[in-house]
Amino acid sequence: MPMSATKAHHHDTIEAAARKPIKERPILFSTDMVRAILAGHKTQTRRIIKPRNNYSIFVGWDDEFVLNDENKEWTLSECPYGYPGDRLWVRETWTKQLSGKYIYRADHPDWELADYTATGAWRPSIHMPRAACRILLQITHIRVERLHDISADDARAEGCTDPGPIAIGEYQTLWEKINGPESWALNPWVWVITFKPV
């Protein structure tokens, strides 16, 4: 079936957006997920879509649209993490030694910091400056789906190591650890971001 004029316009819009100059944006990862990225086990991340007020979600034609419930018009919703080709610089738990060198909890989970750092404590990933970043990722693909649509292969791409369908259960445990108890049951719409190290 041919693409409608409206959807063709949206398709052209996202194609044009993908040709914009490459941008870099920060993204937070937990210590366990940083280790999975460094080990080459994690090449995907799922992030909850936060709809605008009075908007609902529609997915089609491999693009993501939102419907304004007031005027019933579809508009393209930009992924806040960027487009394929854009880069994500990873924020992780970190600190700074008295020498000025940055160190990372993913590398030293049990290290006693008091005698070796300026602050004497690990600092949250949200406070990491760009200068401290050591992991840069390039987005290779973005799609939208319900959380429960994740496949076993995708769960392994998320860094889970259990074989077969068990990987989905492992990912559910990981999701609730990050997003809170019962968050899996909500089955939200999520951005599925596939990436590779730069």
Which residue stretches match the model-derived regions?
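Secondary-structure transition motif
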Residues: M1-V198
